Amino acid sequence: EYLSGNVRAKLDTCRTVDDPDGRYRPNIAALERVLPRQLEPTEITARLGAPWIPSRDIEQFCHEVLDASVDVEHLPQLGNWTARLRDGSRRSVALSSEWGTGRADAITLLDAALNQRLHTVTDATDDGKRIRNDAATLAARDKQEALTTKFSTWVWEEPERATRLAGRYNELFSSTVLPNHDGDHLTLPGLAGTFTPRHHQRAAVARILTDGRALLAHAV
């Protein structure tokens, strides 16, 4: 059990403990052996709306690429993002031309991408309904795809940012080791002599003994 769960947090704890006698060295060595491999930036896909990328990095992206001052806010409890141009900020050509269209500027497309939504352009009809404008929608979605692609490469272009975000990703997603319940050593008293349990069945018994509870979905 000790070598499962968030082993990175356990390893960090052992490394920071005042240990003049080296009592924690075996723990550190064991945890290092099972620690998941750190992924490199080239192995990580950075997409707009990924919860491990802070808002400030997206705001910096807007400053450098869109030439715009944008407030980006993430509400993790709702899984929602908002992006809006700051009051008094000028609207750059990049917003409505290079990274946006006349019907959907780059901030609108950024907001859609952050929320994993494809933007749709609609027109009002004489009776007050709204219908999709296929040509304008296609143009907007092409710009949205270009924007998301640019972001995925921009994230890793600056070394300090790449190191920081790769570290954050690994801390969140490359720190957990699933428990390995091995029941091959169990004697199972009372078991019928004509029945030989399989490896996964012995493992299930070991898990029950360890956790005190389990749901078995084995085929019969």
Protein language model regions, located:
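Conserved pre-motif I regulatory segment
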Residues: T163-A219
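Charged, low-complexity intrinsically disordered regions
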Residues: E1-S175
